[in-house]
């Protein structure tokens, strides 16, 4: 724990394989302790600011419950709860919050903002999501895969199907490279990740005994997969023309029962960071149905509700893994 004390958690690329393993192992320990009712508070009296430019269910609840479990106090600043970017610069906000709080979580748009918060606040800063990255999500994804598959991380064949430029896809590729996994990214060529990120991840994977495959061939990409992972195709606020183009590109990559069978592995599990457009039981789901005639988007309801789906175990693990990050970087 001491070697990560006062460290920021901005991107997985800042961490070694041993450091990632430590965080994942600590997550398991903290989860067991919580279930057994023997958790020890390592953050008693600490004050934490949660700075959200984007609303969230899982990230907010995970940070809040993890902090409370560990004896810390939380202030939530939502999209209209601070002056950052409006009447006050990120640099000034960082220095204000750094003088009052022991740690800061940021969930928003720009990776540059979370980096500036870390640069100027003087306290640990944790990335709860940016447009480019989502490192806390990956810890939960990997922990869940290990729990269910009962395999060491470097033996897991992890496949992401969908938008290859997505922040979760970026973060998963980084994490898989660091952990020495086999990672397949199955997506249309138009949605491949940047060459810069791919080259960096390939270099890391080579050093750690991992392998990365980028392909638009679904059969090739999913073969042998232990995990099939997807995320939403579009984000709220993107213009209609983006939705239409993205849906047309990605509709062949919807995760269906047939796609799951193509893995040839009867033990393949399905993961998703949530929320998911797998039915029409939401306002957005109904709008998608009315506008595009679709009742399911990135995954069918059949797969989402199947025994192969571990999405709610994965969601719970957000709290345990986020707790590990905070305890490791801030705990006594």
UniProtKB/Swiss-Prot annotation:
Binding site for carbamoyl phosphate: 56-59, 83, 107, 134-137, 273-274, 318
NCBIfam families reported in the protein's UniProt record: orni_carb_tr, PRK04284.1
GO biological process: arginine biosynthetic process via ornithine; arginine catabolic process to ornithine; citrulline biosynthetic process; L-arginine biosynthetic process
Its biological purpose: Reversibly catalyzes the transfer of the carbamoyl group from carbamoyl phosphate (CP) to the N(epsilon) atom of ornithine (ORN) to produce L-citrulline.
Residues noted as binding L-ornithine in the record, renumbered to the chain: 167, 231, 235-236
GO cellular component terms given for this protein: cytoplasm
Pathway membership: Amino-acid degradation; L-arginine degradation via ADI pathway; carbamoyl phosphate from L-arginine: step 2/2
Name of the protein this chain belongs to: Ornithine carbamoyltransferase 1, catabolic
EC top class named in words: transferase
Family classification: Belongs to the aspartate/ornithine carbamoyltransferase superfamily. OTCase family.
């Amino acid at each position: 724990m001491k070697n990560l004390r006062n460290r920021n958690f901005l991107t997985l690329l800042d961490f070694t394989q041993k450091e990632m393993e430590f965080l994942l192992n600590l997550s398991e320990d903290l989860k067991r302790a919580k279930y057994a009712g023997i958790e020890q508070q390592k953050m008693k009296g600490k004050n934490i600011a949660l700075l959200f430019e984007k609303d969230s269910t899982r990230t907010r609840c995970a940070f809040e419950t993890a902090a409370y479990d560990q004896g810390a106090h939380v202030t939530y600043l939502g999209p209209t709860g601070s002056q950052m970017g409006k009447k006050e610069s990120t640099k000034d906000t960082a220095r204000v919050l750094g003088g009052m709080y022991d740690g800061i979580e940021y969930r928003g748009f720009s990776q540059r903002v979370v980096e500036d918060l870390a640069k100027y606040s003087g306290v640990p800063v944790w990335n709860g999501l940016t447009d480019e990255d989502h490192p806390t999500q990956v810890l939960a994804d990997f922990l869940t895969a290990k729990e269910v598959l009962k395999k060491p991380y470097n033996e897991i064949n992890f496949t992401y199907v969908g938008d290859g430029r997505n922040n979760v896809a970026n973060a998963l590729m980084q994490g898989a490279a660091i952990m020495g996994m086999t990672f397949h990214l199955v997506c249309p060529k138009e949605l491949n990740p940047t060459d810069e990120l791919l080259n960096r991840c390939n270099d890391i994977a080579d050093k750690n005994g991992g392998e990365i495959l980028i392909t638009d061939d679904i059969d090739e990409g999913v073969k042998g997969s232990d995990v099939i992972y997807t995320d939403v195709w579009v984000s709220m606020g993107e213009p209609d023309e983006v939705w239409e183009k993205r849906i047309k590109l990605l509709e062949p990559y919807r995760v269906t029962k047939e796609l799951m069978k193509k893995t040839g592995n009867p033990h393949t599990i399905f993961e998703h960071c949530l929320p998911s457009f797998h039915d029409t039981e939401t306002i957005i789901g109904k709008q998608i149905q009315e506008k595009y005639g679709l009742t399911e988007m990135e995954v069918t309801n059949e797969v989402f509700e199947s025994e192969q789906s571990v999405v709610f175990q994965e969601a719970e693990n957000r709290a345990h893994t986020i707790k590990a990050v905070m305890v490791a970087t801030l705990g006594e």
